Design a protein with these regions (language model features):
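Short, low-complexity, charge-dense intrinsically disordered segments
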Residues: 1-17, 139-158
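Conserved catalytic cores of phosphodiester-cleaving nucleases, focusing on short active-site segments
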Residues: 38, 61, 81-99, 110
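A short acidic/basic microdomain associated with nuclease active sites
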Residues: 57-70
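Short, well-ordered alpha-helices that flank and scaffold nucleotide-derived cofactor binding pockets
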Residues: 52, 56, 112
Length: 158
């Protein structure tokens, strides 16, 4: 008998998805948390629950990691990633009725600002929802401040 997990694994492996095993584990963790806690809590509660399960499974993660955004060799902003798992997958957690386009754009911008190529958006709403995103580094604009460090600002405006 094929379970949802085995179908997910087969589909991910057949398509050759980057970090298929890790993303499959994270999706499983998401559903186990949603099944146990349900919906209605703040994002921070689900983030802490995710952290507990990742630690129990000895999966390396960083929580609320500051990620700088660069422009012309200067840092122009930063964001905080909910979770970065094993340095490979950026996880964004939300709580709402449905996944919103703004959340999707947010995650894609986070991927664009990092060397991370895979992102998971988890919505702990009334119906558990997730989306997986891939943004290959060779398709991103340069983010390294040293790549455009030769460009100097005149320091003034017209």
């Amino acid at each position: 008998m094929r379970t949802a997990t085995s179908i997910l694994r087969m589909n991910a492996d057949e398509r050759g998805l980057k970090y298929a095993d890790l993303t499959e584990r994270l999706i499983g963790i998401f559903f186990s948390i949603h099944n146990e806690l349900g919906h209605g809590f703040l994002e921070s509660v689900y983030e802490q629950a995710f952290s507990v399960v990742l630690a129990e499974n000895k999966i390396f993660f960083e929580r609320q990691k500051a990620i700088p955004v660069w422009f012309h060799g200067q840092q122009v902003g930063e964001f905080r990633a909910d979770l970065i798992v094993d340095g490979k997958v950026l996880v964004e957690l939300k709580t709402g009725r449905d996944i919103e386009p703004a959340w999707e754009k947010q995650l894609l911008n986070y991927l664009r600002a990092t060397e991370i190529e895979v992102g998971l958006l988890f919505n702990f709403g009334p119906n558990a929802q997730f989306k997986r995103y891939a943004f290959e580094n060779n398709r991103k604009n340069p983010r390294n401040p040293r790549e455009s460090a030769g460009k100097k600002s005149c320091g003034g405006s017209r």
